[in-house]
Amino acid sequence: MAKQTLLSTPLHGVYIPVFLIIFGTYIVKREWVGYAIVVAFSLGFHKFWRGRVRKVLSDKIQQFELSDKAVLNHNTAIYRFRLPRANDVLGLPIGQHLKVFVDVDGKEYSRSYTPLSSDADKGYFDLLVKSYPNGKVSKKFSELKIGDTIGVRGPKGNWKHRTGLARHFGMIAGGTGITPMLQIIRAVLSNFEDPTEITLLYANVSEGDIVLRDEIDALAKKDPRFTVHYVLNNPPENWKGSVGFVTQELIKAHFPAPSPETKVLICGPTPMVNSLREATVALGYEKSRAISKLEDQVFVF
């Protein structure tokens, strides 16, 4: 990783200025060359160091400033937070989450979120947040103004993504629970040598609650390894997806039969997750643990 970071820095932007300073000084006044070398290499080292990619997440709470906000629907938005330097990355492994801290009436509250962005995105990170009237942290997000800050610590989580974890991922996401799924989907589909197939059951209340649908549909249309099926509680007329909740029957109809080569990934509201824990056991999958491990057949984020 250190070697890759080093090679990713455009060294020609260091060598050329250093050479010009030394050569120019030599032409004008040779006795100053020693000083010029010191100055040139100091400037070159500073330029090189500033150009390196730096991971900023740590176990200590850091403050990040809101730089942009994109409202998706009546209660959901994407919040973009600025990293200290334009070349910085968050340093969050795929499928893991960070802990967010906010102040509400003088009291600190926290909640975990998986960013939409990845370490391919430099200088910022994006959080997809659905705000609830009684949610201390999520409601605070809806009140944030550009320039406001949140506290962040991480990374957290037991998912350590790599090629070959399973032959088939059966994903079940509810609402903003799409975020870790989308990170994994992007990672798999961006690797043309990864044979993993993915089936996503994405559940929401209404059609307007389906966030990032354009991207999800585009990925499914582009790559045969990925299939998506939508589920709505309150569907519109002529709805072609499923209606109601994600049930045993729905899982059985869309996912492969339980096997060592299949993993079921779940992320969503607590009642939905609890129901799916029972449904997967009834279908023959191994019982999920309270805190999932990477080797589990059913992994709950």
Swiss-Prot record:
It is an enzyme of class 1 (oxidoreductase). Pathway: Protein modification; peptidyl-diphthamide biosynthesis. FAD binds at residues 142-157, 168-199. Its EC number is 1.6.2.2. Its cofactor is FAD. PROSITE patterns: FAD_FR. Keywords: FAD, Flavoprotein, Membrane, Mitochondrion, Mitochondrion outer membrane, NAD, Oxidoreductase, Transferase, Transmembrane, Transmembrane helix. It catalyses: 2 Fe(III)-[cytochrome b5] + NADH = 2 Fe(II)-[cytochrome b5] + NAD(+) + H(+); 2 Fe(3+)-[Dph3] + NADH = 2 Fe(2+)-[Dph3] + NAD(+) + H(+). Signal peptide: none annotated. Residues 59-162 form the FAD-binding FR-type domain. It is a multi-pass membrane protein. It holds the Pfam family FAD_binding_6. It comes from the Eukaryota. The keyword Mitochondrion applies. InterPro entries: CBR-like, Cbr1-like_FAD-bd_dom, FAD-bd_FR_type, Flavoprot_Pyr_Nucl_cyt_Rdtase, FNR_nucleotide-bd, OxRdtase_FAD/NAD-bd, Riboflavin_synthase-like_b-brl. Gene3D superfamilies: Nucleotide-binding domain of ferredoxin-NADP reductase (FNR) module (3.40.50.80), Translation factors (2.40.30.10). Its main location: mitochondrion. GO terms for biological process: protein histidyl modification to diphthamide; tRNA wobble base 5-methoxycarbonylmethyl-2-thiouridinylation. One of its GO terms (cellular component) is mitochondrial outer membrane. It is found in: Mitochondrion outer membrane. The chain crosses the membrane at residues 8-28, 32-49. Belongs to the flavoprotein pyridine nucleotide cytochrome reductase family. NADH-dependent reductase for dph3 and cytochrome b5. Required for the first step of diphthamide biosynthesis, a post-translational modification of histidine which occurs in elongation factor 2. Dph1 and dph2 transfer a 3-amino-3-carboxypropyl (ACP) group from S-adenosyl-L-methionine (SAM) to a histidine residue, the reaction is assisted by a reduction system comprising dph3 and a NADH-dependent reductase, predominantly cbr1. By reducing dph3, also involved in the formation of the tRNA wobble base modification mcm5s 2U (5-methoxycarbonylmethyl-2-thiouridine), mediated by the elongator complex. Monomer. Component of the 2-(3-amino-3-carboxypropyl)histidine synthase complex composed of dph1, dph2, dph3 and a NADH-dependent reductase, predominantly cbr1. This is NADH-cytochrome b5 reductase 1. It comes from Schizosaccharomyces pombe (strain 972 / ATCC 24843) (Fission yeast). The gene is cbr1.
